Amino acid sequence: MEEDIDTRKINNSFLRDHSYATEADIISTVEFNHTGELLATGDKGGRVVIFQREQESKNQVHRRGEYNVYSTFQSHEPEFDYLKSLEIEEKINKIRWLPQQNAAYFLLSTNDKTVKLWKVSERDKRPEGYNLKDEEGRLRDPATITTLRVPVLRPMDLMVEATPRRVFANAHTYHINSISVNSDYETYMSADDLRINLWNFEITNQSFNIVDIKPANMEELTEVITAAEFHPHHCNTFVYSSSKGTIRLCDMRASALCDRHTKFFEEPEDPSNRSFFSEIISSISDVKFSHSGRYIMTRDYLTAKVWDLNMENRPVETYQVHDYLRSKLCSLYENDCIFDKFECVWNGSDSVIMTGSYNNFFRMFDRNTKRDVTLEASRENSKPRAILKPRKVCVGGKRRKDEISVDSLDFSKKILHTAWHPSENIIAVAATNNLYIFQDKVN
């Protein structure tokens, strides 16, 4: 991260016109692939849109963060569970890329019930000169065939195709909240409210249940699983977080069913801060391993915390994301905003973390310098290549010209989903139905 963390540069933004934006257009997940060349977004309408980095822009410092639409496809359709009389939304909950092994790209996408493996490939040639079919693909009358032709490949305009290669269904009773690809690249896991399943990419009709916290009597249920992720380097290790603010690290070598954790991370509650909302705001909405695998980052309603895998009793770092909302918890409870699930991400070197807030604000915290900055993703101040100015929220007292009052924050505008390029300071921020791409300020 450059020294001036308090200034970022917007390089491009993909905007949909508010006049025709619908609920289906709201972006529900954002994810860079392992090289950062592709950026995938999923929305509430079940669509996946993939953006590709402009090749010419890589060598031009001012344009190195420009992405264009590469492929768009319908990943999930709305369904109906007739046994339970429940509608299954088409909304894309999570997208996860697999490392590229050949010319094609592979990604996982999931809604509440079904995970799909997609292959995204390019085609710039088409076969011609079939003997038994005409150019439109219709069968020819064998009696009209007088010569034997050798089919040839002809150049054509580049076409990007997305095809479903695997469908992993019928394994989750509750809503899927997480998917995570294992470092062995042969397996992945999917987590719902009460269970975590382990899948092999080649087997769609069977999965192994590795965590099950469902009590025999559902009235005894005290917590649910909120997020889960595999360790980036050790294929036997994974973590999952709960609505009680705890994190469990499990080792699949110890037991096939990982109901008994290897490590248990929990911060003791400060009795002086105890309130009616304590349990709600302590629920963890996201958990992420650092790229090094040494740390875990968690996000609850008001804070982002960094945990060392070797210290279970408290986090090594705690960052206040929007502590000024502590006095507003009652109204946030009434309008259901207190249940919003904010995600968090690391930069490529694990030195900076990023997470979202309200009013289309998002926050960055430099772990080394302990400096932080609040930035805004909005149409009004986001012209291409404009410098983003830090924003400040004023709590009571006199408000400066460049500050915004906590009472005037728009809670309908929220940054829940963000992504960071794996090796460069390029970030993607989803603000409702708009996607913004930001890059480092270039002097």
From Swiss-Prot:
CC terms in the record's Gene Ontology section: cytoplasm; cytoskeleton; cytosol; mitochondrial outer membrane; mitochondrion; protein phosphatase type 2A complex
Keywords: Apoptosis, Cytoplasm, Cytoskeleton, Membrane, Mitochondrion, Mitochondrion outer membrane, Phosphoprotein, Repeat, WD repeat
Keyword Coiled coil: no
Any one of the GO BP annotations: neuron differentiation
SUPFAM superfamilies in the record: WD40 repeat-like (SSF50978)
Modified residues (Phosphotyrosine): Y295
GO MF annotations in UniProt: protein phosphatase regulator activity; protein-containing complex binding
PTM sites of type Phosphoserine: S275
Induction per the UniProt record: Up-regulated postnatally and in response to neuronal differentiation.
Residue(s) carrying Phosphothreonine: T298
Gene3D superfamilies: YVTN repeat-like/Quinoprotein amine dehydrogenase
Keyword Transferase: no
Family annotation (InterPro entries): PP2A_PR55, PP2A_PR55_CS, WD40/YVTN_repeat-like_dom_sf, WD40_repeat_dom_sf, WD40_rpt
Tissues expressing the protein: Expressed in the brain. Isoform 1 and isoform 2 are expressed in the forbrain. Isoform 1 is more strongly expressed than isoform 2 in the olfactory bulb. Isoform 1 and isoform 2 are weakly expressed in the cerebellum. Isoform 1 is expressed in the testis. Isoform 2 expression is undetectable at birth rising to adult level at day 14.
UniProt repeat feature WD, residue ranges: 22-61, 87-128, 171-209, 220-260, 279-317, 334-375, 410-442
Domain comment in the entry: The N-terminal 26 residues of isoform 2 constitute a cryptic mitochondrial matrix import signal with critical basic and hydrophobic residues, that is necessary and sufficient for targeting the PP2A holoenzyme to the outer mitochondrial membrane (OMM) and does not affect holoenzyme formation or catalytic activity. The last WD repeat of isoform 2 constitutes a mitochondrial stop-transfer domain that confers resistance to the unfolding step process required for import and therefore prevents PPP2R2B matrix translocation and signal sequence cleavage.
Sequence similarity: Belongs to the phosphatase 2A regulatory subunit B family.
Subunit and interaction comment: PP2A consists of a common heterodimeric core enzyme, composed of a 36 kDa catalytic subunit (subunit C) and a 65 kDa constant regulatory subunit (PR65 or subunit A), that associates with a variety of regulatory subunits. Proteins that associate with the core dimer include three families of regulatory subunits B (the R2/B/PR55/B55, R3/B''/PR72/PR130/PR59 and R5/B'/B56 families), the 48 kDa variable regulatory subunit, viral proteins, and cell signaling molecules. Interacts with IER5 (via N- and C-terminal regions). Interacts with TOMM22.
Task performed by this protein: The B regulatory subunit might modulate substrate selectivity and catalytic activity, and might also direct the localization of the catalytic enzyme to a particular subcellular compartment. Within the PP2A holoenzyme complex, isoform 2 is required to promote proapoptotic activity. Isoform 2 regulates neuronal survival through the mitochondrial fission and fusion balance.
Name of the protein: Serine/threonine-protein phosphatase 2A 55 kDa regulatory subunit B beta isoform
The organism of origin for this protein: Rattus norvegicus (Rat)
Organism phylogeny: Eukaryota, Metazoa, Chordata, Craniata, Vertebrata
Underlying gene: Ppp2r2b
